[in-house]
């Protein structure tokens, strides 16, 4: 009969921590160092976090549902509504002023900014719809629907901006800035940039692509406001660079078009995936 202190030692399974045999580590078993163990645990946590986010999204909810408490989510939702109403009021006034300048001065950048301001009004209205239902603050389907609508609006707006800029370049429209256009450009650049920063922050907290897209549109409006002044100032010092105003309009239009296409490519499949999870509608 074999002694009790002689135990069988099996070949170690790499995925299982093996106990010692007779107080000794089994041969062939490699012990991880503390640093390697920490790296392994960190990788496991990252993997579990990514899988959990996928599960949450597959249930028709945004990632914000796991980050925010109910009262916090409603608080940020109300802030998003207030910012959207403020954005609509400001950009609507700027759009009317920019359209007036565009007609009076034949400015492609002014027309482009006016169209972008109208786009900002529409995108903010979509964000209002997105967060109008208190129970749908974490609804992924509602979020993706809003993004798809924004993508279509971006495409239509970019076509108008590029067409107007090409037309003005073809007839050699010269950029001019008077006191009224200067005031509109400065105000639009500052206000739109501030609105963009606020929307970006709220969009990050609520994990809302629609709010971030609305912020991107406000940022574009601010850039276009400053670009009007830049093109006019360059033309004042060098009349040979008369085409800068129209070129900026084309560039902005192409950027908006690219963003709209990317948005639709990302969101259309997600709308289809979450159409069965309209539990909050």
Curated annotation (Swiss-Prot):
GO MF, one example: zinc ion binding
Membrane-side (Cytoplasmic) residue stretches: 1-80, 130-145, 201-209, 262-281
GO terms under cellular component: early endosome membrane; synaptic vesicle membrane
Key words, A-Z: Cytoplasmic vesicle, Endosome, Membrane, Synapse, Transmembrane, Transmembrane helix, Zinc
Subcellular location: Cytoplasmic vesicle, Secretory vesicle, Synaptic vesicle membrane; Early endosome membrane
Region annotated Disordered, chain positions: 16-44
Highest taxon of the lineage: Eukaryota
InterPro entries assigned: Cation_efflux_TMD_sf, Tmem163
Membrane topology (Extracellular): 102-108, 167-179, 231-240
Signal peptide bounds: none
Annotated transmembrane regions: 81-101, 109-129, 146-166, 180-200, 210-230, 241-261
Membrane-topology descriptor: Multi-pass membrane protein
Primary location: membrane
Matching PANTHER family: TRANSMEMBRANE PROTEIN 163
Its job: May bind zinc and other divalent cations and recruit them to vesicular organelles.
Family the entry assigns: Belongs to the TMEM163 family.
Protein name in UniProt: Transmembrane protein 163
